[in-house]
Amino acid sequence: MSNPTSTPRADGFRMPAEWEPHEQTWMVWPERPDNWRNGGKPAQAAFTAVAKAIARFEPVTVCASAAQYENARARLDDTNIRVVEISTDDAWVRDTGPTFVIDDQGDVRGVDWGFNAWGGFEGGLYFPWQRDDQVARKILEIERRARYRTDDFVLEGGSIHVDGEGTLITTEECLLNHNRNPHLSQAEIEGILRDHLAVDSIIWLPNGLYNDETDGHVDNFCCYVRPGEVLLAWTDDQDDPNYLRCQAALRILEESRDAKGRKLVVHKMPIPGPLYATQEECDGVDIVEGSQPRDPSIRLAGSYVNFLIVNGGIVAPSFDDPKDAEARAILQRVFPEHEVVMVPGREILLGGGNIHCITQQQPAPRKA
């Protein structure tokens, strides 16, 4: 397929909002034993539940290794789920897959950002990561979609959210981290985002959620629910290490105007827990040099904000937590025309993320 040397914006493309119509959702099958406990079996059950929940609303394509293809195909026994063979290093397609962009002529293309496992040799979560850096290209080859590659710019899809009308939200903790693009200034990073996603206004939150090992991805902390309205992870507990992070984010959001000049409406979503892995859960993860150690004393970055908007539905994590019911009620209130489906998210959280992190929506073509 073609690899344009221009930029999406120059070619009339933009990143659509997540609530715009999807053609399908992409996922990657988990198996890495130094990240997923017990050989990945509990995580595979969790991913299966997520895939089947999404498949109620739209088609799903799951990428699996050659070794796991037969197992994945057998477990994902749903006529709306396709399984394709792709080699990967891990299962975070939000960060390794393409960021799809659309135009008004019915075309869909993809941005293939550079990937360095959330920090490369300065805080990255595993090595090597070359197969993960190829995931976006392989997906775009399968779909026969043109690819914009940013060889000299590292970005993960979980570090950005857009409203589809020219505004992007991100965090300084991630995008300005020296382990991503140390050769670029904030203004230069903004320029790349503007050129590749067709955004005009960028809202910088200082930090993401406490102990988020991705260096504070915004998709675990704050997201758009519609143009002009965001959902922010929240705690009123002044002793919670997230308290100051939430307060700082709220100040920025309340002071900001989006690309259309609107003042943002901020909805608050309680943070579950605090949640921790058990010793047994940690012991089930293989110990391999260069991988992320698991420790039951380290708080997990659990968040109800880490959900996926699908065609007519919301697929969100539950944690067997007292706040689960409140989270569901809030999601139903801010998405009154969507069906909210809660899926157990603990096993995904133990691996370092949640439902939004393990999914990547492919927008449907549109014509103006």
UniProtKB/Swiss-Prot annotation:
Look up the record and name the pathway of this protein.
Amine and polyamine biosynthesis; putrescine biosynthesis via agmatine pathway; N-carbamoylputrescine from agmatine: step 1/1
User: What pairs make up the disulfide bonds?
Assistant: none
EC number(s) recorded for this UniProt protein = 3.5.3.12
One Gene Ontology biological process: putrescine biosynthetic process from arginine
**Which InterPro entries does its entry note?**
Agmatine_deiminase, Peptidyl-Arg-deiminase_porph
One of the Pfam families matching this protein, by short name: PAD_porph
Q: Where does the record place the catalytic residues?
A: C357 (amidino-cysteine intermediate)
Is Hydrolase given among the entry's keywords? yes
- Molecular function via GO: agmatine deiminase activity; protein-arginine deiminase activity
Which keywords belong to this entry?
Hydrolase, Polyamine biosynthesis
EC class of this enzyme?
hydrolase
Q: Which reaction does it catalyse?
A: agmatine + H2O = N-carbamoylputrescine + NH4(+)
Family in the record: Belongs to the agmatine deiminase family.
Function, as annotated: Mediates the hydrolysis of agmatine into N-carbamoylputrescine in the arginine decarboxylase (ADC) pathway of putrescine biosynthesis, a basic polyamine.
Q: How does it assemble?
A: Homodimer.
What protein am I looking at?
A: Agmatine deiminase
What gene, per UniProt, encodes this protein? aguA
